[in-house]
Amino acid sequence: MEGSSYRVVFEKGGVYLHTSARKHQDPDSLIAGVIRVVEKDSDVFLHWAPVEEAGDPTQILFKKDPSRGEPSTSEEEPTFDPGYEPDWAVISTVRPQPHLAEPRKGAEPSSSRSSWAFSVSLGELKSIRRSKPGLSWAYLVLVTQAGGSLPALHFHRGGTRALLRVLSRYLLLASSPQDSRLYLVFPQDPSALSDSFHHLQLFDQDSSNVVSRFLQDPYSTTFSSFSRVTNFFRGALQPHPEGASSPNLPPLPDDEPEPGFEVISCVELGQRPTVERAPPVTEEEWNRYVGPEGRLQNVPELKNRIFSGGLSPGLRREAWKFLLGYLSWESSAEEHKAHVRKKTDEYFRMKLQWKSVSAEQERRNSLLHGYRSLIERDVSRTDRTNKFYEGPENPGLSLLHDILLTYCMYHFDLGYVQGMSDLLSPILFVVQNEVDAFWCFCGFMELVHGNFEESQETMKRQLGQLLLLLRVLDQPLCDFLDSQDSGSLCFCFRWLLIWFKREFPFPDVLRLWEVLWTGLPGPNLHLLVACAILDMERDTLMLSGFGSNEILKHINELTMKLSVEDVLTRAEALYRQLTACPELPHNVQEILGLAQPEEPSSPSPPVSPMPLSPTRAPLPPPLPEEVIPQPDSSLEILPEDEDGA
């Protein structure tokens, strides 16, 4: 690569390979490197090379060798785990600046680390898989046309969005209709693109016509081909003037909806009602609902009182067992005692399962060993400012550890996923009993276990429902977020994942959760809580002219500054405002629990994020460019591009 034929168009440091999930404490399992996009002659290459301790990147480029095959993450490298996602590590931001020398073709590897270096032509890429949004560093996995996977690239200092933006100059990246985190790679060639779409059967209509429309107006065509939308959303679907390359493209008639659309008329909401919260339920008031034999009476009224005012702190230890399904509302006091004895025996039988596993057995059980390691790391960082958990030898930490490992025995398919310790901590703090806390936690997980499933379908559905509610409540706010590439509401991901655990002070979390557990006034009050927070910050977001980076930063800075009573009051007011609308769309009624889902008349293509294109390229959820992940944040900030794009 000499002279003018070689040009680096993108370069990013802090891109690591995680070579062994099981040996995460070994520094050699994390290989720091630099990722580059390089133009050479008429081709474009993606290079990754490790950075040696001296600060110089290893000078080696991977050259595809048909006799050796593509680099793989399967049998050739049994300890490599492309899905390994480290937890919320706090690391130094002071790093030596590597010397970014030009890669030299054919250089010999200088160490074992240099053997991981690779180079691949962009034309050889088949797909790019992006990590799910969560509480860890983002990574990308690239798959070649030959079917092999390159080592996963973990961006410890952010940059996935910037890299994808650069790749979109040379490739068309379309989100798979089966998996929104998988980007299918197509060449910048209309005939090849048409062929690819035809074989994938992504469109009901003639693929050549769709590709023509896609190249002329990618923003609108993407939505019209992949999504069920409404004329309610049309303001958000119009491309920017500079985004369409053909000014003569005929507009779609308003009265002729395209196939696959669900047309719903825009509705006018009435005035938002005034709502006042009630005082908490006291122990004296609770006792008035206790009838003969210790059975609770008039349970719907009692639940409504809890929804309206919450519970006094001294009552939570007993009441939470009912709210979380550990104790039955209809059972007598004697039946409760028998139930607790039965559940206590069941708990300790499950606990004995992992307690009796020897160290040698655990070494041969990588799944259990992985769960234990992850739990130990998470427990050591959970609510350590709370006196119940502070200190290195605090018994509360041991209880957290034991309950979470026992839950792995109870629900082995799900096991342990980062974030679960955040859900258990307040429960254990309140009930202060190992067995009771376990079964209450199981009840909570029955409500939210879908949030932690690998497919992330539940989280994607909830974000879609949140977006629909927000469009009905505040279309201008949605238009503003769309204009700032924040319309996916990815900054709300952590809110929904762990039910606002990190957004409110600890006592407010207790109040919020007990209100949500009542199931009133409908099944998705937590979505209205998210709408309420956005509604409270509406003017700040819009009038300040925030861009996408500032929006993410502002949302992160709301942590511990919100008032739970104000948020709950506004969420209930939003619910009443929506339910008072006589023409509320049916899909919104479903979210609020006012209507049953309709049986689909014909299969519809799943909602999918729009493909990337050179003219207008909305990218996956924004992540940071230079900000190190912090323990209390799953969001990253991406600085503005130097070219102002």
Curated annotation (Swiss-Prot):
Domain of life per record: Eukaryota
Question: What range(s) does the Rab-GAP TBC domain occupy?
Answer: 310-520
Residues recorded as bearing Phosphoserine in the entry: 602, 604, 608
Question: Looking at the UniProt record for this protein, which Gene Ontology cellular component terms does it annotate, in alphabetical order?
Answer: autophagosome; cytosol; recycling endosome
- UniProt keyword Transport present: yes
| Site residues by UniProt (Arginine finger) | 377
Residues with PTM Phosphothreonine: 615
Report the subcellular localization: Cytoplasmic vesicle, Autophagosome; Cytoplasm; Recycling endosome
Which SMART domains did the record assign?
TBC (SM00164)
Q: Does the keyword section mention Transport? A: yes
GO BP terms in the entry? autophagy; protein transport; retrograde transport, endosome to Golgi
**Single GO term (MF):** GTPase activator activity
Extract the ranges annotated as region (Disordered). Answer: 57-85, 596-645
Compositionally biased region (Pro residues)? 600-624
| Positions of region (Required for interaction with OPTN) | 217-309
Site feature (Glutamine finger) residues:
418
What keywords appear on the UniProt entry?
Answer: Autophagy, Cytoplasm, Cytoplasmic vesicle, Endosome, GTPase activation, Phosphoprotein, Protein transport, Transport
- Anything noted about its domains? The arginine and glutamine fingers are critical for the GTPase-activating mechanism, they pull out Rab's 'switch 2' glutamine and insert in Rab's active site.
* PANTHER family linked to this entry: TBC1 DOMAIN FAMILY MEMBER 17, TBC1 DOMAIN FAMILY MEMBER GTPASE-ACTIVATING PROTEIN
* Subunit structure as annotated in this protein's UniProt entry: Interacts with OPTN; this interaction mediates TBC1D17 transient association with Rab8.
Function of the protein: Probable GTPase-activating protein that inhibits RAB8A/B function. Reduces Rab8 recruitment to tubules emanating from the endocytic recycling compartment (ERC) and inhibits Rab8-mediated endocytic trafficking, such as that of transferrin receptor (TfR). Involved in regulation of autophagy.
Identification of the protein by name? TBC1 domain family member 17
